[in-house]
């Protein structure tokens, strides 16, 4: 399988996001990236939008519903939101949407900070493998993977996608 170029996806996502926000009458949203890949995508997206807005970062490790099964990520860091959440229009950015559990955890954490006016979900990739009813408003590409395949994003400069075959990783 040939993977798309993240830089091309980001350019198209910037255009699509501007159109989405304009259609909804949103002119000054707050941008939040989900660590780690979502932060990288958010930084690239803000650059493509030529937008100097501050970027909030979320670490959803403590909010995940599979925390007791998978354990805690070894590099948990505090979330940093340099702006109010209450009443704001938010753009929540993640790298890869798979099960929807990371986005659910991010929404739970955001609502602990306040009640936003709206949340627009932006994802570089949607793997169309949702376990929860979560869909991005803006997506770079939708891919279908075999059960033993995963996508890894590396970055931040440059962003690169890698297809991993878990069946050969043993």
Curated annotation (Swiss-Prot):
Source organism superkingdom: Bacteria
InterPro entries from the UniProt entry: PRibTrfase_dom, PRTase-like, PyrR, PyrR_bifunctional
Enzyme superclass (EC): transferase
Record motif PRPP-binding, residues: 90-102
Molecular functions per Gene Ontology: uracil phosphoribosyltransferase activity
Enzyme Commission code: 2.4.2.9
Keywords from the named record: Glycosyltransferase, Transcription, Transcription regulation, Transferase
BP terms from Gene Ontology: regulation of DNA-templated transcription
Catalytic activity line of the entry: UMP + diphosphate = 5-phospho-alpha-D-ribose 1-diphosphate + uracil
Its biological purpose: Regulates the transcription of the pyrimidine nucleotide (pyr) operon in response to exogenous pyrimidines.
Family per similarity comment: Belongs to the purine/pyrimidine phosphoribosyltransferase family. PyrR subfamily.
Name of this chain's protein: Bifunctional protein PyrR
Biological source species: Pseudomonas syringae pv. syringae (strain B728a)
Upper classification of the organism: Bacteria, Pseudomonadati, Pseudomonadota, Gammaproteobacteria, Pseudomonadales
Gene: pyrR
